[in-house]
Amino acid sequence: MEHNVVIAGFGGQGVMLIGELLARAGMEEGKEVTWLPSYGPEQRGGTANCAVVVADEPIASPLLTEPQAAIVFNRQSFDKFEPVIEKGGLLVIDSTLIDRKASRADLDVVYIPATDIATELGNSKFTNMVLLGAYLGKINPISIASVHGALSVFLTGKKAALIEVNKKALQAGVDFVNKK
């Protein structure tokens, strides 16, 4: 089994964090993983994306030309990555911030008002976890429990107080896709 995903948005939206969480959780499950970040040329507020591959066998390359899935936080990322997802792939969209529908009928598309859900949980900064939960609710290359474990690696010190609300945000994303 090999699964790959591109995660894309603006810098500061938590794009890299959820990519690192997926990679770390995969490692904790004994899987082969790669995490490849990419940043736009801007110092602040620019685009950022990362590619994550989780596999049972060694991974030939971390580069994704036709990802199986994409999680997109903003319109710019949506416009860039929708055309390159493989046929039958998954596209998870924050419908709070993205004002158009996918143009491809050959994709499984999840429109989730992730920013709205995160705001209801107390802070729009949890949008990344809501989107990750929606992704894991549809395709589970790794378990939610492993992601919970990985949270404690990245949220340390004062940020450790945010672990429980991040778990709630993950679950809110899972619940959203499972209701449909």
Q: Residue spans of the language-model regions?
A:
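Active-site cofactor/cluster-binding pocket
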Residues: 1-180
